[in-house]
Regions:
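Beta-strand-rich domain onsets/edges
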Residues: 365, 371-391, 463-467, 472, ...
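Bacterial N-terminal signal peptides
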Residues: 7-16
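C-terminal outer-membrane/trafficking sorting elements
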Residues: 480-489, 493-567
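Active-site/substrate-binding loop(s) of hydrolase catalytic cores
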Residues: 161-307, 311, 315-322, 346-348, ...
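Short, acidic Ser/Thr/Gly-rich low-complexity loop/linker segments typical of extracellular
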Residues: 403-405, 411-435
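Structured interaction patches on ligand/partner-binding surfaces of diverse proteins
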Residues: 446-471, 564-567
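A short, solvent-exposed beta-strand micro-motif common in secreted/extracellular proteins
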Residues: 428, 436-447
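A short, amphipathic beta-strand motif
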Residues: 392-400, 428, 468
Length: 567
C-alpha cells in the first residue's frame, strides 16, 4: 500500500514538473511576441513622474492614463525592458480586423477601404495628373525597404516654391496608426475636387502652399508586402520614427533614413504651420513634448488653435469624440515626456509651429469606420489650415534695392527657447503667429542696422500685413561683425546655443570660444553630423559677447560667428 502511494506521489510530482516546464515564463513570452509580431504592448503601474521620465528615454510610451503606463516594445528595446524587472502585464493583441483592401483604384477612391501599396502610389500620381494646375507630386525619400515616402503640394501655382506660406500635414509615421493615412488622401481629394465649388477651399489653395504626406512610414504599414495585414509602429529597422529626431537628451540615437529624408524636406520648405496625425487616443497635443517646466512663448496661441480643432470636432462628432485629458487638448509633457519627437524638432530647431493630433482611440481604424473618421475631422482640418492665413505676414527688404533680406524676427521680453522666426532667404517673407494684442518686433540681419516695428496690431482671425525696410551699414567698421556663415540660436543665450553646420563642416571639428578681449575660453574637439545642430554648452561663460570658431580637423576649413551670453 505504501509503495503504491509512493508511486502515485512520484507520478504527480513528475506530471507537475512537466507541466511547469511547458509554461512559458512571462519574459520569454514577451520575447516571442516581439519576435513574431515586430512589437508588443505592455502596461506597468504608474509610480511617479521621475520614473516615467526615465522610462521614456529608453522605450516608446504609448499613453499614460488611470495610473497605468502603456508601453510599446520593439526588437531593439525588449531586452532593456526585461532587464529593468518591471512588474508588467502583456496586452493581448486583438487580431487586426476590418483592414479591407480595395480591389481596384476606383474602389480605393471611395475612401472606405485601404489601398494596396501600388494603388496608393497610383492614387498619388493620379492627383497630379488630374489637377496639374493645382497639384504636384514630390518624393520626400524612400524607406529602408525602398518604398516611396510621397508628398503632394496643393496650391494655386504648385510648380513655384516660396511664393506662399507653406503648411504641412503628415500622417502615419507609426505604421500601425492607419486612420490618418486615408484621411489625408481624402483631404487631398476634397481640396482638389472642391477648388471651384467652395470659396473656403479656394481661399486656402490660392493663398497657401499645402503639403500633404499621407504615409510617412510605409515599411511599418505595408511591411515587405503590397497589402496591410500586420502593421507595426516601427520602421523596418525597429526604430520608432517619432523618437528619432535630433534631441539634446538622446544625442546618440542612430538617425534612420526616413528621419534624415524628412529633416531635409522640412528644412527645404520652411513650413510655418504643420500637424502630425497619429492614433491611440483622441487629443490635440501641443509643445513642448520634452519639457514639463518650460512653456513655449506662444503657449496661449498653441492652446487656442488646439482648442479650436477639438471643439470643432465636438460640434460635428459629438462630445464623446476627442475628449481625452482636457476635453481633447493637452500640452505634451503634461501627458508624458517624449524625447526625439518630430513636433519639438519642427518647433525648436526649424522655428515652425507644429502640433500632434491623435484622431482615433484605436490604433488601426477599421475600414468600415474610415468615413466616420473623415466626417468627425474634415471641418477641423480646414480650420487648422486657416490659422496660416492669420497673424503677421511680412516682407523684409533692402530699403534701396527692395531685394529680400533674410532676417531674424524677435520679440524682446517675449521670445525664448527658439521661438523667434526668420524671413525667407529667397523671398524675404515671414509669418509670425501671435495672440491678439499690440506687439513690438525687432529685425536683425547680417550687414544691416536693426529695425524695431512698434505697436503692430494683431487681431483674431485676421491677417496683419507688414513691410520692413532695412538699411545696410555704410562701412565695415560700423557693422557689428555679422560676417558669420553660421546660424547661431538662440542668440542671446543663457544655457546653450546651437549652430546649424554649413556645407563642408562634417566629421571631427575643433571648437574654440573666444571672449571680447581675445582670451580663449574653451577649446575642444566635437563630432559634427550634417543636418544635425551642434549644441554648445555655455553655462560656465559669464555675460558678454563671444566669437565661436569651428575648424574641420581634416579640411582645415573654418567657420565662425558671434553670440551674446546673458545671465
Amino acid at each position: 500500500m505504501a509503495r503504491h502511494i509512493l508511486i502515485i506521489v512520484l507520478i504527480s510530482v513528475l506530471t507537475a514538473l512537466n507541466s511547469f516546464s511547458q509554461v512559458v515564463r512571462p519574459d520569454e513570452r514577451l520575447r516571442q511576441i516581439v519576435s513574431q509580431n515586430g512589437q508588443a504592448e505592455v502596461t506597468i503601474p504608474y509610480t511617479d513622474r521621475q520614473s516615467i521620465d526615465l522610462l521614456t528615454v529608453n522605450v516608446s510610451i504609448l499613453s499614460v492614463k488611470n495610473k497605468i503606463v502603456y508601453v510599446s516594445l520593439s526588437p531593439l528595446t525588449v531586452e532593456w525592458f526585461i532587464l529593468q524587472k518591471y512588474e508588467y502585464q502583456i496586452v493581448e493583441k486583438i487580431e487586426t480586423r476590418g483592414l479591407v483592401s480595395a480591389s481596384n483604384l476606383s474602389q480605393a477612391m471611395n475612401w472606405d477601404k485601404y489601398p494596396t501599396y501600388f494603388q496608393y502610389d497610383s492614387l498619388m500620381q493620379s492627383f497630379s495628373k488630374l489637377y496639374p494646375s493645382l497639384c504636384r507630386l514630390d518624393t520626400i525619400g524612400t524607406s529602408v525597404n525602398g518604398k516611396l515616402v510621397l508628398a503632394l503640394k496643393i496650391s494655386g501655382n504648385p510648380l513655384i516654391d516660396g511664393d506662399k506660406p507653406a503648411v504641412f500635414y503628415t500622417s502615419t509615421m507609426h505604421g500601425d496608426e492607419t486612420g490618418g493615412f486615408i484621411m489625408m488622401l481624402h483631404l487631398a481629394d476634397y481640396l482638389l475636387k472642391n477648388y471651384s465649388a467652395s470659396s473656403r477651399v479656394k481661399t486656402l489653395v490660392d493663398n497657401l502652399a499645402i503639403w500633404i504626406n499621407p504615409l510617412a512610414n510605409p515599411d511599418g504599414t505595408y511591411g515587405t508586402g503590397n497589402t496591410i495585414s500586420s502593421p507595426t509602429r516601427y520602421n523596418a529597422n525597429g526604430y520608432d520614427l517619432n523618437r528619432n529626431f535630433p534631441d539634446p537628451f538622446t544625442p546618440n540615437t542612430v538617425k534612420q533614413k526616413e528621419t534624415l529624408d524628412m529633416m531635409k524636406f522640412m528644412r527645404k520648405h520652411n513650413f510655418v504651420l504643420s500637424a502630425n496625425f497619429h492614433s491611440g487616443e483622441e487629443v490635440v497635443n501641443y509643445p513642448w513634448d520634452r519639457w514639463l517646466s518650460k512653456f513655449h512663448a506662444d503657449d496661449s496661441w498653441f492652446n487656442s488653435i488646439s482648442r479650436a480643432y477639438a471643439d470643432t470636432a465636438h460640434v460635428y462628432a459629438g462630445p464623446a469624440y476627442m475628449n481625452f485629458l482636457d476635453n481633447g487638448v493637452t500640452r505634451g509633457a503634461v501627458w508624458y515626456i517624449v524625447y526625439g519627437g518630430r513636433q519639438d524638432f519642427m518647433t525648436w530647431e526649424l522655428h515652425g509651429r507644429e502640433v500632434t493630433i491623435e484622431i482615433d482611440d484605436q490604433y488601426v481604424t477599421p475600414a468600415a469606420q474610415l468615413t466616420l473618421l473623415w466626417q468627425n475631422n474634415w471641418h477641423s482640418l480646414l480650420g487648422y489650415l486657416e490659422n496660416a492665413l492669420y497673424g503677421i505676414h511680412g516682407l523684409v527688404r533692402d530699403v534701396s534695392t527692395h531685394n529680400p533680406v533674410p532676417a531674424k524676427v524677435f520679440i524682446n521680453g517675449y521670445d525664448k527657447d527658439s521661438s523667434q522666426v526668420y524671413s525667407d532667404t529667397l523671398t524675404g517673407s515671414f509669418v509670425r503667429f501671435l495672440s491678439p494684442g499690440l506687439w513690438n518686433l525687432t529685425f536683425s540681419a547680417k550687414g544691416y542696422r536693426p529695425v524695431t516695428m512698434s505697436n503692430i496690431n494683431v487681431t483674431s482671425r485676421l491677417e496683419t500685413d507688414l513691410i520692413v525696410d532695412m538699411s545696410p551699414y555704410t562701412n565695415k567698421v560700423e557693422a557689428p561683425g555679422y560676417e558669420t556663415s553660421l546660424l547661431l540660436y538662440p542668440n542671446p543665450a543663457h544655457d546653450d546655443i546651437r549652430a546649424i553646420p554649413p556645407d563642408g563642416l562634417t566629421g571631427k571639428v575643433n571648437v574654440r570660444i573666444i571672449n571680447s578681449t581675445g582670451m580663449l575660453m574653451s577649446d575642444y574637439i566635437a563630432e559634427v553630423v550634417h543636418g544635425i545642430p551642434i549644441i554648445i554648452d555655455i553655462k560656465m561663460l559669464p555675460s558678454g559677447t563671444y566669437t565661436i570658431v569651428f575648424t574641420g580637423i581634416v579640411t582645415r576649413t573654418s567657420f565662425h560667428g558671434r553670440f551674446v551670453v546673458i545671465k
